[in-house]
Amino acid sequence: MTSPRRIRLFLDSNVLTGGIVSPWGLDKATLSLCAAKVCRMVLAEVVRDEVEDNLLLHAERLPSLDADQLIEDYRRLIRLTNAELVPYPDKNLVRSSRHLIRHAADVPVLLSAMASRPDWLLTHNTKHFTKTVAQRTKLRIATPAEFFRTLSTLLG
């Protein structure tokens, strides 16, 4: 008997960072679904690098033991999820795709999501990852709250 296909979640850096640094919440619940292998985390290298930079900045403001624990929690999460890695998009493609999204820094993230074709792209950045962007790219873009509301209707 084959196991059911897992929902593939492409996580933007704000969801991933929020889930790591927050003691609870939907970001952390999203990471828990991935760690439990209920969902499959799709992790773009561009997102991973941004998260690691953000975590190091966050860790600098913490007591030494807490900072060490934060970094260890992140490493453990990456091991547990066995994330599907998405390489950086080609620089020429990034330049030529600038029209797809309002903020230039989001182009590599968007292209990585398009290349990986996840079931969902989860982000809190609804100012840039708009419904128009979703229509242009054929991506299902939502906040973690929207994802969980949809999930609850499927299970209920």
Q: What residue ranges belong to the model's regions?
A:
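Conserved nucleotide-binding/hydrolysis micro-motifs of P-loop NTPases
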Residues: L16, R48-D49, K127-H128
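PIN-domain endoribonuclease scaffold, especially VapC-family toxins
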Residues: A35-V94
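Active-site neighborhoods of divalent-metal-dependent phosphate/nucleic-acid chemistry enzymes
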Residues: R79-W120
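Short secondary-structure boundary segments
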Residues: S13, E45, H124-T126
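Short, surface-exposed amphipathic charged segments that create phosphate/polyanion-binding patches used
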Residues: L56, L100, L154-G156
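Short, well-structured N-terminal submotif of metal-dependent ribonuclease cores
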Residues: M1-L43
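Acidic, PIN/NYN-like endoribonuclease modules and their adjacent C-terminal/linker elements
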Residues: V107, L111-M114, D119-W120, T126-G156
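Short, flexible helix/strand-to-coil boundary loops that buttress conserved ligand/catalytic motifs
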Residues: I20-V21, L55, V133
